[in-house]
Amino acid sequence: MAATDLERFSNAEPEPRSLSLGGHVGFDSLPDQLVSKSVTQGFSFNILCVGETGIGKSTLMNTLFNTTFETEEASHHEACVRLRPQTYDLQESNVQLKLTIVDAVGFGDQINKDESYRPIVDYIDAQFENYLQEELKIRRSLFDYHDTRIHVCLYFITPTGHSLKSLDLVTMKKLDSKVNIIPIIAKADTISKSELHKFKIKIMGELVSNGVQIYQFPTDDEAVAEINAVMNAHLPFAVVGSTEEVKVGNKLVRARQYPWGVVQVENENHCDFVKLREMLIRVNMEDLREQTHSRHYELYRRCKLEEMGFQDSDGDSQPFSLQETYEAKRKEFLSELQRKEEEMRQMFVNKVKETELELKEKERELHEKFEHLKRVHQEEKRKVEEKRRELEEETNAFNRRKAAVEALQSQALHATSQQPLRKDKDKKNRSDIGAHQPGMSLSSSKVMMTKASVEPLNCSSWWPAIQCCSCLVRDATWREGFL
């Protein structure tokens, strides 16, 4: 019990004591110092404009800051929503403002609008992530860092006079936890005052019924509580934008000229432009910056740190130190890393085994195919060798026959060349015999006929020539034997 009390008293903070000063110290100049430092450093303010193409976003920005921003003409044929940021350096008196206007180009122009809000949400989260990464650096320089976090979203509502579109409700519901939303009815001069009043009531009722949280001007500061409470009742603001100057009476005012009359931008009886400018720039700009940092960014930061495993205390409400959390997460990540490495190693081993089996199977198939081709090749080679031997045998036989035929032809020609001499000799002998033996004339004529029947033949091809020459040889042999 005593230990518990001691621990309780040791952890309790002492009550501050109020003391009076004996003279002037000087810390009453702290506000002046802060103002001087802020003026030297300058301010940044980032506005996100969401609305359909051609609804008047660029015109309203030019009217709000009383200048002309150079912007590209938007197209109605964008394939998807595209965020286009443009940064400008403005100066009023001795105050510098780095103004960034982010336009949601192509919003609402697609046939399928289910994911039209996604690029906007991703852009806002990306700016939060950039700031978080800068904060987590060991050597951070937030003083020189250009803060691109969105401070306010001006949501432009089409003046239909009936109700909000489903796209508007879904988009604002997705954005209300990430950015300060101020709904605006654009081109309010296109509907009558009675319709505009009913339209405002209808919009606020739909926002409340669907749980959409828009930015409420703060009423906790006594200096602005009254005016902010009045302006909260005028939401959403019905505005008209114009950069043209029209002469009304004896002065030039920004207005829109119509055949039926003139709509003055800064006339509160015509539209809520002045109310919007007062609430957005002159009264609540710093509160919008503070709400972005302390509410929306802190929510994003907390979610990110919880995803990383950081928390303020355990289940017993014991505070965790950053070192303990880091060590715990480090051990957890190392064990997870080892488990993943083991799984990957096992997967690699299994994959290697499967690959080896596949390679062995492929190798076996290739060997079988090679052996088959080898056998086919050997069989073809054997057949070719047999054909070659048969051809050589036929060639040799042909050469032998050719040589024999040539020899026989030469003999036949030689024998034929001896025939005239024999004829003369035989003629002479027959004449002698005829003179002595007259009965031999018939047989002599037969012999001459036999000789005449064995003349050489002319053959056109070699095989018939061989046959004919063979017959000739036989006839010649018979004739020689006969003679």
Swiss-Prot record:
One of its GO terms (cellular component) is axon. Widely expressed, including in brain, heart and platelets; most abundant in aorta. Isoform 2 is expressed at low levels in specific brain areas, such as occipital pole, frontal lobe, temporal lobe and putamen. Isoform 1 and 3 are highly expressed in specific brain areas, such as occipital pole, frontal lobe, temporal lobe and putamen. Isoform 2 is highly expressed in prostate, testis and ovary. Isoform 1 and isoform 3 are expressed at low levels in prostate, testis and ovary. Residues 411-420 have a biased composition (Polar residues). Transmembrane segments: none annotated. InterPro entries: G_SEPTIN_dom, P-loop_NTPase, Septin. One of its GO terms (biological process) is regulation of SNARE complex assembly. One of its GO terms (molecular function) is molecular adaptor activity. The keyword GTP-binding applies. Its main location: cytoplasm. Residues 51-58 are annotated as: G1 motif. Signal peptide: none annotated. Residues 1-16, 421-433 have a biased composition (Basic and acidic residues). Gene3D superfamilies: P-loop containing nucleotide triphosphate hydrolases. It is found in: Cytoplasm; Cytoplasm, Cytoskeleton; Synapse; Cell projection, Axon. The modification N-acetylalanine is found at residue 2. Residues 320-413 form a coiled coil. The modification Phosphoserine is found at residue 10. PROSITE patterns: G_SEPTIN. Residues 103-106 are annotated as: G3 motif. Pfam families: Septin. Belongs to the TRAFAC class TrmE-Era-EngA-EngB-Septin-like GTPase superfamily. Septin GTPase family. Septins polymerize into heterooligomeric protein complexes that form filaments, and can associate with cellular membranes, actin filaments and microtubules. GTPase activity is required for filament formation. Interacts with CDK14. Interacts with SEPTIN5. Interacts with SEPTIN7. Interacts with SEPTIN4. Interacts with VAMP2; the interaction inhibits interaction of VAMP2 with SYP. Interacts with STX1A. Filament-forming cytoskeletal GTPase. May play a role in platelet secretion. Seems to participate in the process of SNARE complex formation in synaptic vesicles. This is Septin-8. It comes from Homo sapiens (Human). The gene is SEPTIN8.
